């Protein structure tokens, strides 16, 4: 349903943000 789609998009966005944060942290080393 719509809610599961919203949750899936949110999870994907959270994963993408975590990856970006990890890349930024590595770049700052």
From Swiss-Prot:
UniProt keywords, alphabetically: Amidation, Amphibian defense peptide, Antibiotic, Antimicrobial, Fungicide, Secreted
One GO process term, biological-process aspect: defense response to bacterium
UniProt GO cellular component terms: extracellular region
Subcellular location: Secreted
Annotated tissue distribution: Expressed by the skin glands.
Modified residues annotated as Leucine amide in this record: 29
Disulfide cysteine pairs (residue numbers): none
Domain of life the protein comes from: Eukaryota
Additional observations: The primary structure of this peptide is identical to that of Dermaseptin 01 from Pithecopus oreades (AC P83637).
Purpose of the protein: Has antibacterial activity against the Gram-negative bacterium E.coli and the Gram-positive bacterium S.aureus. Has antiprotozoal activity against L.amazonensis. Has antifungal activity. Has no hemolytic activity.
Family, per entry: Belongs to the frog skin active peptide (FSAP) family. Dermaseptin subfamily.
Protein name listed in UniProt: Dermaseptin-H7
